Amino acid sequence: MKIWRFFLMKERTRLPFDNLPFYNKVMDKTAIKKLISRLIDHFGMTYTSHILDQLKTSGFQQATDTAISLGIDDLLTAPSKGWLVQDAEQQGSVSEKQNHYGNVHAVEKLRQSIEIWYATSEYLRKEMNPNFSMTDPLNPVHVMSFSGARGSTSQVHQLVGMRGLMSDPQGQIIDLPIRRNLREGLSLTEYIISCYGARKGVVDTAVRTADAGYLTRRLVEVVQHIVVRRTDCGTIQGIFVSPIRGRERDRNEIVVRTQILIGRVLADDVYINRRCIATRNQDIGVGLANQLINLRTQPIYIRTPFTCKSISRICQLCYGRSTTHSHLIELGEAVGIIAGQSIGEPGTQLTLRTFHTGGVFTGDIAEHIRAPFNGKIEFNENLVYPTRTRNGHPAYLCHNNLSITIDGQDQVQNLTIPPQSLLLVQNDQYVESEQLIAEVRARTSSFKEKVRKNIYSDLEGEMHWSTNVCHAPEYVQGNVHPILRTGYLWILSGGIYGSRVVPFPFHKYQDQVYVQPFVAKHQSLSDSYVDQVEHRSGDSNCYEKEEQIFSYSETETDRTISNKHRDSIYVFYPNNYNIKGKKQMNRFIVSLQCDKEWEKKIIPCPDAILRIPKSGILQRNSIFGYSNVEHGIPDGSNMTTPFSLDLSREGDNLQIQISYSISYEDGERIQVMSDISIPLVRTCIGFDWEQIDSIESEAYVSLISVRTNKIVNNMVQISLMKYPPFFMGRRDNKTSPNLMFHNNLDHTNLLSSNGASQLISKHQGIICSLSNGEEDSGSFMVLSPSDYFRIVLFNDSKCYDTGNQSNRKDPMRKIIEFSGLLGNLHSITNRFPSSHFLTYKKVLSKKHSIFHNSFNTFQVPKYYFMDENMIIYHFDPCRNIISNLLGPNWCSSSSESEFCEKTFPVVSLGQLIPESVWISEDEPLPESGQIIAVDEESLVIRSAKPYLATRKATVHSHYGKILDKGDTLITLIYERFKSSDIIQGLPKVEQLSEARLNNSISMNLKESFENWTGDMTRFLGSLWGLFISARITMEQSQIHLVNQIQKVYRSQGVRIGDKHIEVIVRQMTSKVLISEDGTANVFSPGELIVLSRAQRMDRALEEAIYYQTMLLGITRASLNTQSFISEASFQETARVLAKAALQGRIDWLKGLKENVILGGMIPAGTGQHIHRSGKRNGIDPRIGNRNLFSNKVKDILFHHDKVDFFSFQDNSYKYHNILKQQLK
């Protein structure tokens, strides 16, 4: 309706009143509705039509004279848009970082993004009206947008504000918003996203219009026979309606409650302080509705079509006033068809609108509480529980009313937080004015639907579960594990290789392998051969000599074969053994099958001759190659050659000590001297090395391999008393310069052309054991140098070391040189020379966490240090500062005060650390990872990626499983608010009308029945508790269904009378299903009959009829009516007619549709002459029904002669009859 500026002039010759005021105001659509209603009340329908004709003529004339046009210069953008978009982008960047750190998962990030940009778009839309009002009040865009005719504020907002969030073809909101408006122009990406919404609007306009028309047809079909036939059905039942719902300042809610009351009929007298202000069967007008709202706060009992006793009809008082005029509905009115058209018609019209956002955002359902002024907030921490908000922020949840106090400088204010609210601040926290401190849960839950979202791995590597991720025991053997508690899942970086990529059939744990990326042409000349040499003397197994020929890869330009010798300790004994000299040829052992025919093939490597069978099939454990290099041990020497020739001098004696450790199963918890359950890092046998005899030039050894019965999970923890320096060396080899080696002998064959051999470290990696112990299909994990990074703990060494360390060399060593990272390479005690390291006790430390609970409790060891002067120093885990327990300075031999302030982090082997955590004094951790080695001054960290998994999510892999990039990692299950616009709302109205199994009504029926059964059984006993609870549950479901349908329409400003929807819902719940428990042969089990018919037959028969109430959809209800002609004209004509002929059904032609089909007179129409008397049904309206309470009790308890839902014993029936006679 356009804006009309009109004048109602005083016309004494035409208007009957002389005191008509002069009215000069801009009239919008709502004001014109009120004007027409007042004109009808004062002048009647005929005179009002003449006034409206004059108003229409004046409007068209004024619109022609005005001639409003729209130009591009009229599109003015609000000046505040720039900083609003910039602020939203900054918030989105913070949300992206939190997701990268693992603090929030993908669903929470999407929610945050949607809320941020929706709030920005809405604020910009609200700024649009004041901007026009101040700069250009007569702007044509401004005038058109507020006219109510064409072009709403949301559409103008796309022209001068920002387009905002769009939806994809599936209706899901895209988290990338369109920041520009149509005046500024769209970028290519924004245009493509905008096309989604445009195409969706075109398709919806065509498809949804047809759906809305079909919905209207079904709605009319199910209620076409309902006509007002009686004045009063005599029922005393009804429903309670609250006049005010919510806070009184919410004017929109008051208007909604007023519209519900207007036109209804009271089912009981209304008293205020013992004074009757309204009587039963009195219709409620505007004056009485306002009086009830102003005077009452408790619910009002009104009549409704739900409880009308008329069979297949409806009475005048249960329906109430007509929606066309302010009088009771006339007899003969076809209210069923009116109800169907009233619900279906708005859907048909509103589908012509284009809603590109995919739904009205429902984030404003929760009510926010803000601080009134600056101050410190205080509350009882024992009454709140830590939780997470739906956006992933930490918060507190209060189950009961929580009293909080805000203490400002000049004032103190107490606030009460309602139950089930979220508190977003901590105790004793300083809050600023208007800061959000609590979020109150909405009283009525919005439409929600459960959605599954898959999270895919962004990293190739190995899966690890945090100790905070628990799994149900019944799913241990399955591949899908449900998560019982919120926690982290980690993907530890590592490459996956197998026989199909790089052929390594003889790989071992901690072996170094040569891995090249895929090339254009990749062929395999030979596999890797492991030279397993055993030098035996007596019964002792001394050491192992390994020789590996690395993988051969061929490209079109060059070929490379590298051969590598490596020495490693294989088996250890606590004592030393002398080894006698013995020579033995090295041999290659292969575990394959072959025949006995051989051929010689010379590999261009100077040390080996291979024998390969002609058929190419090798035999298991057969010797097919010999090495030309002999390895020998001199007679009588003590292990002089278990090391490489690169040693500066050979050691004479080596003493090996065995340290003890605890082995346990994965996930097992062990009690260690405390009541605290401590999860341990998986360890295996560790070795303490000690060089006894000093030599002129020191020689060091590195542990390369450890033999265990089974490859273990997690970490191998090893402590070395003396730290061996690793180094980079250069070998004089023209074909392979700059080869890095350590305790190894490297050979590169001469096939490399033009010096194209590459550094070993570039494609070399360490084979890592699988945590789950699986060794199937020959696949294994290789950790390349790119999977590691190193972080230096302290740059300034003078704070913790002596002066002789000033010339210490700390090169950035290649991780690949370590020949396998096996654990702690250095103890922390070496940081404090001549001091003793003591672990005193375990303590619990509270630290802010980002998953599940906002405060997570974990274990931190409490350390004490004792130096050579026997002075004990305490390490405070809360401050990370070492302090002297007895004196001001912990280092008594030095006077520098800086020693007291030196800090170091508490880290442990195998610890998983997220990104941005400060463990170094210089900078935070650059990326997430797992600590795999602890050095004297640095940490070696394996790259990892954390993923946050919430409760009820499912993990699609086992612990320790190797995953490729892009594999499905987690499936998150979350609740999403259903969009409430009319395009997305029409399917929801159809879903509710058809009573689908997945709607909220069906889900709440069972829970509501159980709740009411418990309450009623407690008050009335089991005899009537079950019966009344079943009846109340059905009534509550009817009301809930009406409210849900109304919510969809009201979200778009469409007002539909509740009585129209109640007529539809009444037909959906009017049928019952005969059960098989009864013994009466009147109805067949499984037959659908009308409830009133079942009640009548139940009263007439000796035996009870057992049935259960049903919630039928409108389609099914239309196919189960009393008229088979109406059913056959709707759907399934052949089946309906054949079934009716076989059953011998008779159609009594009581509805409108069947009479129209047969050409008869329809049983509807107004204008009947009825004699009205002062009494209605024999009851004086001035006195009322004095036996109203007695009739209510009868109607509740003895509406049936026998209780139909449940069978009771004979004494129960006897008690039932005695009580009935007393009431009579």
Curated annotation (Swiss-Prot):
A GO BP entry: DNA-templated transcription
Family the entry assigns: Belongs to the RNA polymerase beta' chain family. RpoC2 subfamily.
Cofactor comment text: Binds 1 Zn(2+) ion per subunit.
Entry function: DNA-dependent RNA polymerase catalyzes the transcription of DNA into RNA using the four ribonucleoside triphosphates as substrates.
Name recorded for this polypeptide: DNA-directed RNA polymerase subunit beta''
Self-association and partners: In plastids the minimal PEP RNA polymerase catalytic core is composed of four subunits: alpha, beta, beta', and beta''. When a (nuclear-encoded) sigma factor is associated with the core the holoenzyme is formed, which can initiate transcription.
Organism annotation: Pinus thunbergii (Japanese black pine)
Coiled coil: none
Chain residues that bind Zn(2+): 233, 308, 315, 318
